[in-house]
Every structure is written in structure tokens, then in C-alpha cells.
């Protein structure tokens, strides 16, 4: 069952004035359309926002019932101040990188791959550490984000990117890599360490 309706995802529209913009009005319109498909008329609307600033057009629209951030776990502590009284979820989180059965040492070091999202990342092994110590430049490890959830009671939950590896968006490697390394379950349907 759908518990929350989504009016937008991967949205990163930052406002530079106090006026409602076309993007804010569009968010209001999309939220209205989404609510029309709710047979009970009770489900709240969220959006997966890449920009967690309260000046984001989606938040400024007033149409978002549940604040949703994609990543940005370091901003969560500011949610009660920036969005008083609003429920909060991680609409997309983690994006840790792992290959089942491959471990990079030292295990207590964190590896960002690539260092910045626009830079290439090269390692001839085409593998990522399964110690939950490797993540994309915009994200965090499972443990790091889970720690934020555990220590902030107002966090209603998180949607981890992703449950399964998938063909496409090869991250952190480029060709000849053909799939993501994000999943807690690999392409063969076998759990990685972070699954447990």
C-alpha cells in the first residue's frame, strides 16, 4: 500500500527570492494531481529533494506535507529548526558501494569513489569494498546514515539506494562496468554484507 504520495524526485530547485516561483506553483499543481488519485484523501505528499535548504521551491510551495531529503544526512540536525512541526524522511539515502566478498583494507578507513562526482574513478579490479566503508561522493555508508536515523527521533525512516544492484548507472566505474554497485543484494540475487 502507498503510505506517502510523491510529487517529485531528484528535485534541486533553490529559490533566490521570497516570491513563489513557477516551480513552487508547479509543485502545488503536482501535489493537487497526486492527491486526486488518493481514494481516501488521507495520504500526505512528499518530494525527494536534492537541495535541503528551506528556500527550495518545492518546500516554499507549502504543498509538501512530509519533508524529504535525498542524502544530505549532515543537514538532518537542522530539520526541526528549518521545518518546524513537519515530519521528515530520507527519501533516498546511502548510495554505498560494495562488491559481495571483496574487502579493502584497512577496514576502518572510508573510501569515497570518486572523490567528486564529475571525476573519473579507476581501479583495475572493478570492485568495491564490502566492509561498508566505500561510498559515492554525494552519499555516505549505511552505518553513517543509520547512526543519524538512530540519534534523531524525528526521522520517520529512510529509503536506501538501492535494494538490488541494477544494470545501468555504472558507479563508480565507467565502461566496461555495466551496473551499479549500490545494492545490498547483487545481480545474482545474493545478499552482500550490508544486507545483514
Predicted regions mapped to residue ranges:
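Glycine-rich phosphate/diphosphate-binding loops that line cofactor/substrate pockets in enzymes
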Residues: 1-2
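Substrate-binding clefts and catalytic carboxylate motifs of secreted carbohydrate-active enzymes
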Residues: 6, 13-47, 59-61, 78-196
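Short acidic loop-to-helix transition motifs that present clustered carboxylates
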Residues: 47-54, 72-75
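Short active-site oxyanion
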Residues: 62-67
Amino acid at each position: 500500500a502507498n503510505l506517502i504520495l510523491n510529487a517529485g524526485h531528484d528535485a534541486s530547485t533553490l529559490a533566490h527570492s521570497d516570491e513563489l516561483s513557477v516551480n513552487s506553483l508547479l509543485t502545488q499543481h503536482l501535489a493537487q494531481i497526486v492527491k486526486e488519485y488518493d481514494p481516501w484523501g488521507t495520504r500526505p505528499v512528499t518530494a525527494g529533494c536534492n537541495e535541503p535548504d528551506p528556500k527550495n521551491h518545492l518546500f516554499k510551495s507549502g504543498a509538501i506535507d512530509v519533508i524529504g531529503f535525498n542524502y544530505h544526512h549532515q543537514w538532518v540536525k537542522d530539520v526541526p529548526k528549518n521545518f518546524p512541526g513537519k515530519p521528515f524522511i530520507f527519501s533516498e539515502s546511502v548510495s554505498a558501494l560494495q562488491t559481495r566478498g571483496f574487502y579493502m583494507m584497512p577496514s576502518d578507513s572510508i573510501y569515497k569513489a570518486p572523490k567528486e562526482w564529475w571525476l573519473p574513478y579507476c581501479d583495475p579490479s572493478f570492485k568495491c569494498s564490502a566492509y561498508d566503508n566505500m561510498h559515492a561522493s554525494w552519499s555516505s555508508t549505511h552505518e553513517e546514515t543509520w547512526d543519524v536515523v538512530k540519534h534523531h527521533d524525528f526521522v520517520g525512516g529512510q529509503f536506501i539506494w538501492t535494494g538490488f544492484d541494477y544494470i545501468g548507472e555504472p558507479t563508480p566505474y565507467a565502461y566496461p562496468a555495466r551496473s551499479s554497485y549500490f545494492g545490498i543484494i547483487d545481480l545474482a540475487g545474493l545478499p552482500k554484507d550490508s544486507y545483514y
